Swiss-Prot record:
Record's function text: Part of a sulfur-relay system required for 2-thiolation of 5-methylaminomethyl-2-thiouridine (mnm(5)s(2)U) at tRNA wobble positions.
Entry's Gene Ontology BP terms: tRNA wobble position uridine thiolation
Gene name of the encoded protein: tusB
Family from the record: Belongs to the DsrH/TusB family.
Protein name, entry field: Protein TusB
Main location: cytoplasm
Keywords assigned by UniProt, alphabetized: Cytoplasm, tRNA processing
Assembly information from the UniProt record: Heterohexamer, formed by a dimer of trimers. The hexameric TusBCD complex contains 2 copies each of TusB, TusC and TusD. The TusBCD complex interacts with TusE.
CC annotations in GO: sulfurtransferase complex
Length: 95
C-alpha cells in the first residue's frame, strides 16, 4: 500500500498511521508531511523504525527551505517517481 502524509506530524496521529503499515508498504511525505523527516526529530525516529520504504517530495522540501535539514535516510523524489509509486500500489491511503 502507498501511504501519503500531507499534514504536519504534529497535526496528525503518526503512530496510528505507522501501526497500519506492513513490510513492503511505501510512505510518501508531501506538503507539510515533509516536516516528519527533519533530521534529529522524534518523528523521524518513528518513521525509521517502521518496516516501510520512505520517500519525500523534493518540491515540497525546497518550498519549505528544508533541504539542508532533512534526513538522508529518506529518499527524495520528484513527481515522476511519485507517479511510479502510485502505479506500483493498487491501494493508497492519504493522511
Amino acid at each position: 500500500m502507498l501511504y501519503t502524509l500531507s499534514r504536519s506530524p504534529t497535526q496528525c496521529d503518526l503512530p496510528a498511521l505507522l501501526r497500519l503499515t506492513a513490510a513492503g508498504d511505501d510512505l510518501l511525505l508531501l506538503q507539510d508531511g515533509v516536516l516528519a523527516g527533519l533530521a534529529g526529530s522524534a518523528h523521524l525516529e518513528l518513521l525509521l523504525n517502521a518496516p516501510i520504504s520512505l520517500y519525500a517530495l523534493q518540491d515540497d522540501l525546497e518550498a519549505r527551505g528544508l533541504t539542508g535539514h532533512f534526513s538522508h535516510k529518506i529518499t527524495v523524489i520528484g513527481y515522476n517517481h511519485f507517479v511510479e509509486l502510485t502505479e506500483k500500489h493498487r491501494s493508497q491511503m492519504s493522511w
